[in-house]
Amino acid sequence: MSFSVTARRESPCGFKGAIPIGLRVSILASGSAGNLTLLETERTRILVDAGLGKRETLARLAAAGSDIGHLDAVLITHEHADHCNGLPQVLGIWKAPLYVTEPTMAQLQHNLPETFGKRLRGVESIQAGQRFAVGDIDVHAFAIPHDAADPIGFTFRTNGSKVAICTDLGYMPELVKFHLRATDCLILESNHDLDMLKVGPYPWVVKQRVLSRTGHLSNHAVSEFLADPEGFDSRARYLVLAHISQENNNPDLARLCAEEALGRRPAEFAFSGELLVASQHAPLKPLEL
């Protein structure tokens, strides 16, 4: 593998706009046209995926009220364009360490040779199952089933709070369900409606890919997970439906399916948090934990 591993950097304290809370999560964009999520504590700032260009990334950060003075890490879930198209620009702005698995990095070197074709400094090689720290945030990478080189999801823990980001997966293995338990903020894919996908504009081969066990979660699959107390433990303060297809789903339908599923839970396992839907076009309100 032709990239180097550097020592982890601590983040400076007290940056402009520091937040007197445990953790703030800003979902700046979510969908097939670009994904971008920022996690912040008073000390640390982590960007998960970089699917938007420089101008739009800066605009989304400003719209979410986030300081853009420094960034401590960029984490990439997998190499598909909607998760890394803006990565060269993001790294050019902030010079932040890049956390990525070796198979994903190999694909980035192939897909973006001008940026990643040479030996790089400031790259942290990670793997599924690994725990590591970025500033005062503990990160755990876990494997997800998707048609990419080495796709991963993440959980983040700090100051007694836990956040999980889990999108781009074809089904819900038990290990994934395990990682999503006891979260305060769960960001979960609800990509498509089965009927809309079947009659939609995608070619047959793409429909088969989306429906496969390495494709994307449907509203129905998410509903089955949310209705099952042995799957979703309902502890989350925020449940965010994410990566919603613009062609084969709509936010209202995804929300309706999730609400119906949550309504089927036994009373003793009722969900009392806030159900939200992330957007491709504008940042979701910052979620404070």
Indicate residue ranges for each PLM-predicted region.
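Active-site metal-binding motif and surrounding structural segment of the metallo-beta-lactamase
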Residues: 54-101
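Metallo-beta-lactamase
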Residues: 102-153, 157-160
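Metal-dependent catalytic neighborhoods of phosphoester/phosphodiester hydrolases
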Residues: 85-94, 109-112, 249-256
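Active-site neighborhood of phospho(di)ester-bond hydrolases with catalytic His/Asp-centered motifs
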Residues: 48-51, 71-79, 99-102, 164-167, ...
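Conserved beta-strand hairpin/beta-sheet module of binuclear metal-dependent hydrolase folds
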Residues: 3, 8, 13-64, 151-167, ...
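Cap/insert and terminal regions of metallo-dependent hydrolase folds
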Residues: 174-277
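Short, basic/aromatic-enriched C-terminal tail that caps enzymatic domains
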Residues: 273-289
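Active-site environment of divalent metal-dependent phosphoester hydrolases
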Residues: 33, 81-83, 106-107, 148-149, ...
